[in-house]
């Protein structure tokens, strides 16, 4: 069975994103936590802070989620004014100064920022071209945009695991693919999309291998896609449990379960 691309509306539905998917930080935290077992370990907030070394003034984190990057930038660069914003009110929680905002229409004056962050979020934006124009609009001359996403080759082992588990549940050789978030804006596609606004784009590749000896981190990652459970064409909970069994079987046979990762940041000017 050939994997079918995830329909755009499943990944960009603002109502779903602001409630089931990111109404709280629970699911995002589950996806982030899987990287605890990655080698080499990449300090993503630290990389952002390093890239902001020459930036002064205000920095917006568009699609800031649970504020992981906001907290680090505020800690390491107290001289910067950090503006957190996200489409979901719920996930913003108690982040000081956060506001609900749409990346396609940023509530920021033209040329007001020294930098803007758009980290693992442009694949959720319906009109990516408009969002990229907005990123460019709000930057002062010489300002930078830092964007992140995954490669189309990222975590293919998890896609294979899901389809095998789904096939087991359905009684067929291989089940349907799960919702793939970053497929709408991959590392391979990003330079062309960002290049419509930015003249200089530098990619920082972040490869690694996740290796676990306990199924739970992988299961938690898969379960974090619960917001799309009724869109996957397979009983969600049953597939999760079958995936758990398959991961445990691999660990028993091979000593661990491995996932190959490739994400990256793009620094744009």
What are these regions (language model features)?
Residues 185, 191-269:
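Conserved Class I S-adenosyl-L-methionine
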Residues 129, 136, 141-212, 229:
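Conserved catalytic/acceptor-binding region of the Class I
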Residues 49, 71, 129-136:
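A structural alpha-helix within SAM-dependent methyltransferase catalytic domains
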Residues 2-56, 68-69:
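Conserved class I S-adenosyl-L-methionine
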Residues 56, 113-114:
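Local beta-strand N-terminus motif with an aromatic residue
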Residues 117:
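A conserved beta-strand element that flanks and buttresses the S-adenosyl-L-methionine
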Residues 57-105:
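Class I SAM-dependent methyltransferase SAM/SAH-binding core
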Residues 120-124:
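Short catalytic micro-motifs in class I SAM-dependent methyltransferases
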